[in-house]
Amino acid sequence: MANENHGSPREGASLLSHSPGTSSQSQPCSPKPVRLVQDLPEELVHAGWEKCWSRRESRPYYFNRFTNQSLWEMPVLGQHDVLSDPLGLNATPLPQDSSLVETPPVENKSRKRQLSEEQPSGNGVKKPKIEIPVTPTSQSVPSSPSIPGTPTLKIWGSSTEDKQAALLRPTEVYWDLDIQTNAVIKHRGPSEVLPPHPDVELLRSQLILKLRQHYRELCQQREGIEPPRESFNRWMLERKVVDKGCDPLLPSNCEPVVSPSMFREIMNDIPIRLSRIKFREEAKRLLFKYAEAARRLIESRSASPDSRKVVKWNVEDTFSWLRKEHSASKEDYMDRLEHLRRQCGPHVSAAAKDSVEGICSKIYHISLEYVKRIREKHLAVLKENNIPEEVEASELEPRLVYCYPVRLAVSAPPMPSVEMHVENSVVCIRYKGEMVKVSRSYFSKLWLLYRYSCVDDSAFERFLPRVWCLLRRYQMMFGVGLYEGTGLQGSLPVHVFETLHRLFGVSFECFASPLNCYFRQYCSAFPDTDGYFGSRGPCLDFTPLSGSFEANPPFCEELMDAMVSHFEKLLESSAEPLSFIVFIPEWREPPTPALTRMEQSRFKRHQLVLPAFEHEYRSGSQHICKKEEMHYKAVHNTAVLFLQNGPGFAKWGPTPERLQELTAAYKQSGRSHGSSSSSSSSSSSSEAKDRDSGREQGPSREPHPT
């Protein structure tokens, strides 16, 4: 994918006829604008504004005879007064990167009346090789107050085709959907999961928020701690590895009931969470708090007399040492803390074990009840529309095909109306008061994926409701907090994907989503919402016979371990070229089972290590985050492992030349696509945010403070 695909399209275009004094002889093809009764404020008239009528659009617009500017909405005078500042020297400066600009540089941000809305303009952005379909216009426009400078809420079907074309023209491209797949599978039948519906998704999101709140309250009330960061998200990932239930998100049929992931992360934070320490006073305070929390816990729980004696003696010894040692260094305090943890940790964990298991069990059983409620709601929606919940499976012809998106066996019910409006470069989609947001560029990406993959909605009547369900699903899966869950959805930089495709034939992502995928063929967590946008289903259910794949799994230990088992089984059973290039954290203290198994696998052809802070990931919130927050530095080493069978190694082997080019691709920072006008101060603050965000990738593996 060429680098110019990351640029922004040209949007400036003047009207054919502006000034009422323009001679008809000089521009014979340009009709004169029809003037309306001028009911404008005196300030606007003095500034050169007048009200005209658009014959083509059959509505009024506002034209400035001094600047040749045209607006659909009534202008509001801002910083740039054309009389006192005709050149706009005092106006708000535009960023040098025009891809950030969607509105004129005035405070009201009124939408320009441009020919770019009415006809395609030449630009360097990769355009789809398909025509934009004419969408139905029978749906009504919901009533909404019209605020000056803000587009009115509209239903997708009520917009004209030209305006849709302008909306669907991306300004930033971080994908290449033209690459065809080389992944071959056996022909498979449709999935039995129920099709998504906004009412069902709304109920599911409400119940997940309640479940998160239950988890927080249980941790606070029973253990006196805040929930470990991202532990609920990793609990859902770990549970879905073993879950045999019917819900695509919440677990309902798991063995064992107590989640190893949730249990491990809560126990790591008992009696208190140990954070990274930079200063001596912090180390002293942490040692005191740990000793106090350990004594309080052992006194309030049922524990053996020996355990109580050991903990209390070590705590008193620590307090005595703190009273005597006034000149201790940070290292002295940390050594003392490590000694206290070794002495008291096993006894504290034994005393808290039953309580923590109770938290895990309680959350699972609440989830089970919620799944029943969601299922009842879903079946009621199908019954209301006379759609059977079970469809008789037809016989499949045993043949090999290139992989294709997931199809659903159950027919989709009619979709309710969903509201959409655009705020600057963000598309806002609202259903029953619940709003989700996505940038215009990623909205256009979803449109393309839907156009390529969906087979039951050629008129795009269900596009917006399905986008709302998709965005709401991922929002609920990773939480609504700032930067929450973004590390679990991080992806590789564009330069790396380009290199993987060019050198190793990679055309498929094993762990992605419609929002962060680079290729149009990928596996994702949710076949019901994502199948309409190109997903081939969950990776652990996907069984290719040949092809070259990239795998960057969410950093959940149980999921990564299951991934290794799945890949080795596929490599063992296939005689066709098969290759998996896996990117996982190089956690060594202790090493993860997945990393250890891949290093010892007979299919490992090479292992590459990318040093911490010398390579980047793309944010999991790339579909909505600011441009300067799109990339962040990894705070841990990343191990790149090549798992290939014999034919795959012969075809896509990691030769020294290929490895050198792959390493060089990581040196091309994705930040170079950002605005070059950013100041050094904003860059440094952005880097700090990036590092904080990067820590989300492995909080369960954070080293103990040193």
Swiss-Prot record:
Residues holding substrate: R234, R264, E557, W587, R588, E589, P590, P591
Catalysed reactions, as listed in the record: a 5'-end (N(7)-methyl 5'-triphosphoguanosine)-(2'-O-methyladenosine) in mRNA + S-adenosyl-L-methionine = a 5'-end (N(7)-methyl 5'-triphosphoguanosine)-(N(6),2'-O-dimethyladenosine) in mRNA + S-adenosyl-L-homocysteine + H(+)
Molecular-function GO term, any one: S-adenosyl-L-methionine binding
EC main group: transferase
Top-rank lineage group of the source organism: Eukaryota
Compositional bias annotation for Polar residues: 16-29
Compartments where found: Nucleus
Classification via Gene3D superfamilies: 1.20.1270.10, 2.20.70.10
Residues found modified as Phosphoserine: S30, S116
Region (Disordered): 1-34, 88-148, 663-706
Binding site for S-adenosyl-L-methionine: N552, P553, P554, F555, F613, E614, H615
Disulfides per UniProt: none
Enzyme Commission number(s) of this protein: 2.1.1.62
Motif Nuclear localization signal: where in chain: 109-113, 668-686
Modification Phosphothreonine occurs at: T152
Activity control mechanisms: Cap-specific adenosine methyltransferase activity is inhibited by zinc.
Coarse class of the protein's main subcellular location: nucleus
A Gene Ontology term for the protein's cellular component: nucleoplasm
Keyword set includes Nucleus: yes
Record key words, sorted: Methyltransferase, Nucleus, Phosphoprotein, Transferase
Comp. bias intervals (Low complexity): 132-147, 675-686
A GO BP entry: methylation
Role summary: Cap-specific adenosine methyltransferase that catalyzes formation of N(6),2'-O-dimethyladenosine cap (m6A(m)) by methylating the adenosine at the second transcribed position of capped mRNAs. Recruited to the early elongation complex of RNA polymerase II (RNAPII) via interaction with POLR2A and mediates formation of m6A(m) co-transcriptionally.
Family: Belongs to the CAPAM family.
Subunit structure: Interacts with POLR2A; interacts with the phosphorylated C-terminal domain (CTD) of POLR2A.
Name of the protein in question: mRNA (2'-O-methyladenosine-N(6)-)-methyltransferase
Species the sequence originates in: Mus musculus (Mouse)
